[in-house]
């Protein structure tokens, strides 16, 4: 059970004694869950406004009714307050805040910390751990395009460390002058670092400076009669100037724009972000959100904070930002905080004209198109949820569905997958897999029993059981889940249902069984609820197959090494520690394997032969 956190909190006294400093406030419900995070210049005035008389939208009224406790944090500046607010929203995702769902993390270009660093791209919040980051980039295609350009200009390695360490002669990239071959010692540390320094300036957007520096180095090398070196610099200049003419690289730094368009309809909103360089759209991204009770200004405020302040390692910034028409005074403080983070002023364009207006209209058209697709898809999904609710004869709306599927390879490497769907759609971040242990090979019934038991046990502890649990299988599988439900006494808390292929084993002809009901049900193959059941089941099946294949692959590679005489647990561990995994080991050459402590040249040869 979750404790009631409202008992010792005196709201009236708290409001009366609030500070007038700037800071962040958090509103919590009776369970201690943060339901809203806000930032205020004057905490006393802002927080009290929620509880004073006056016109409020229905969403705010509903939120205030649930407030059982308020916590505050005083911030030394508006900038610090915005950062804290953003971090708390990302961490807790309060249900009454405007939330932006990013299906994937932004990609970064990363220069590694190796002696001879490699340049690559990495997606994720921990990109900074890999090395020096440049970004974020809006899309994978834009970061890959930049990598291709880099490879043509700067002969910095892009290969994986395992490949780099195993080289005994230069690869093709050296032959076509796209790498300096540090792997085999064909370049000095000083020469490599020089190219690396110019590359970093290039990635930081200092293109004019890069041109000047390379040009100066070319003339200096020529004067020193280092003609081969001068030729390298000349080739770099030729490519850079060609790119400049093609407007692939933005040499005129003041011609970079971010354009943010918002389109609202009913209780939904869509935000389109276009990135413009020299008159071309080079990247775009979209967000669609539930905007009930919000206006365009509050959505713009939330988005600017999310996109520009929410990423601690961002170091690529536009010179100009064009915005949809909003109440400028309400976002001025946020604009100043963003400029403070950058360390320089941004040109905010809130009343665009001419070409700038053309870009804004394009962004708003994109936002409208994406919202139409989003609302259509959402409407279809809601119809499926309602249909499933009706079929299962549930009183309450379905908020969370989980589905289990079992996968194994000839009885081995058994995996149970659990996929999650909410009332918003598939929740990929909540998907998980269970390694099934201590059962008879190929025993799907025992596997279902174990997986469901583990999920129910953790769900009761965390108070996050689903409304509906789907089992991929027929009567035998659902009976195993029923046994678990009886054991934990949750027969009336979670609706159990299974989807079996039946005798015909044809998609669309599946048999449906409800928990603790021996009746065999069938639905029309176009029934919305039936379509949802199959959609969730198929997702669970795919998730299980992927996990099972990974496990089989890992087991196979591990067993290959185990068969080699002289490679025991200690040496296997040493190999994995050195290469980072079986896949990297399989790519290594004999001389590289022999570098591992305890591995002789003869043993290294045997290990190499196992993989080839």
Curated annotation (Swiss-Prot):
CDD domains: GIY-YIG_UvrC_Cho (cd10434)
A Gene Ontology cellular-component term: cytoplasm
One Pfam family recorded for the sequence: UvrC_RNaseH_dom
Keyword entries, A-Z: Cytoplasm, DNA damage, DNA excision, DNA repair, Excision nuclease, SOS response
Domain GIY-YIG, residue spans: 20-98
Taxonomic superkingdom: Bacteria
Gene Ontology biological-process annotations: nucleotide-excision repair; SOS response
Domain UVR: 208-243
Complexes and interactors: Interacts with UvrB in an incision complex.
Similarity comment text for this entry: Belongs to the UvrC family.
Function, in words: The UvrABC repair system catalyzes the recognition and processing of DNA lesions. UvrC both incises the 5' and 3' sides of the lesion. The N-terminal half is responsible for the 3' incision and the C-terminal half is responsible for the 5' incision.
Name of this protein: UvrABC system protein C
Organism, as annotated: Francisella philomiragia subsp. philomiragia (strain ATCC 25017 / CCUG 19701 / FSC 153 / O#319-036)
């Amino acid at each position: 059970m979750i404790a009631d956190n409202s008992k010792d909190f005196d709201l009236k006294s708290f409001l009366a004694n609030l500070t007038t400093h700037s800071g962040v406030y958090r509103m919590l419900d009776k369970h201690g869950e943060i339901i809203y995070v806000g930032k205020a210049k004057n905490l006393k005035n802002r927080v009290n406004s929620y509880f004073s008389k006056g016109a409020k939208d229905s969403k705010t009224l509903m939120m205030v009714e649930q407030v059982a406790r308020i916590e505050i944090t005083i911030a030394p500046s508006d900038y610090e307050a915005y950062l804290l607010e953003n971090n708390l929203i990302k961490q807790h995702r309060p249900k009454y805040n405007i939330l932006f769902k990013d299906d994937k993390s932004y990609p970064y270009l990363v220069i590694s910390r190796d002696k001879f660093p490699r340049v690559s791209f990495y997606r994720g919040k921990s990109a900074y751990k890999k090395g020096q980051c440049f970004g974020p980039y809006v899309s994978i295609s834009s970061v890959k395009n930049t990598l291709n350009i880099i490879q043509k200009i700067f002969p910095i390695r892009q290969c994986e460390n395992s490949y780099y360490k195993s080289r005994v002669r230069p690869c093709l990239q050296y032959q076509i002058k796209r790498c300096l071959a540090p792997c085999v010692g064909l370049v000095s540390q000083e020469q490599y670092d020089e190219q690396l320094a110019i590359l970093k300036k290039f990635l930081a957007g200092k293109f004019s400076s890069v041109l000047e520096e390379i040009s100066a180095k070319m003339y200096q090398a020529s004067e020193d009669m280092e003609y081969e070196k001068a030729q390298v610099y000349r080739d770099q200049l030729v490519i850079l100037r060609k790119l400049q003419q093609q407007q692939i690289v933005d040499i005129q730094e003041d011609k970079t724009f971010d354009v943010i368009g918002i389109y609202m309809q009913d209780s939904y909103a869509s935000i389109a972000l276009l990135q413009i360089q020299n008159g071309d759209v080079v990247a775009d991204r979209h967000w669609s959100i539930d905007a009930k009770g919000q206006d365009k200004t509050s959505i713009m405020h939330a988005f600017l904070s999310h996109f520009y302040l929410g990423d601690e390692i961002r170091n690529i910034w536009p010179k100009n930002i064009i915005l949809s028409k909003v109440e400028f005074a309400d976002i001025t403080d946020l604009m100043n905080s963003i400029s403070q983070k950058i360390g320089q002023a941004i040109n905010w364009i809130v009343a665009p004209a001419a070409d700038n207006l053309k870009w804004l209209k394009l962004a708003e058209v994109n936002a409208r198109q994406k919202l139409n697709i989003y609302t259509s898809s959402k409407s279809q999904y809601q119809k499926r949820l309602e249909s499933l609710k009706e079929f299962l004869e549930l009183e309450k709306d379905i908020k969370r569905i989980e589905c289990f599927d079992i996968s194994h390879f000839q009885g081995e490497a058994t995996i149970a997958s659990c996929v999650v769907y909410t009332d918003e759609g598939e929740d990929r971040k909540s998907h998980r897999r269970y390694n099934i242990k201590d059962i008879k090979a190929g025993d799907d019934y025992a596997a279902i029993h174990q997986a469901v038991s583990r999920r129910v046990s953790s769900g009761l502890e965390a108070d996050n059981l689903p409304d509906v649990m789907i089992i991929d299988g027929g009567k035998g599988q659902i009976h195993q889940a029923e046994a678990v439900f009886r054991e934990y006494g949750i027969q009336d808390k979670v609706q159990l249902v299974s989807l079996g292929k039946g005798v015909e084993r044809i998609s669309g002809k599946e048999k449906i069984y409800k928990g603790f009901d021996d009746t065999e049900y069938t639905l029309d193959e176009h029934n919305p609820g039936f379509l949802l059941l199959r959609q969730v089941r198929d997702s669970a099946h795919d998730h299980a197959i992927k996990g099972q294949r990974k496990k089989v692959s890992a087991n196979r590679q591990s067993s290959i090494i185990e068969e080699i005489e002289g490679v025991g647990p200690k040496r296997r561990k040493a190999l994995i520690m050195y290469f980072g995994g079986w896949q990297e080991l399989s790519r290594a050459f004999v001389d590289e394997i022999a570098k591992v402590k305890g591995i002789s040249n003869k043993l290294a040869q045997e290990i190499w032969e196992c993989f080839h």
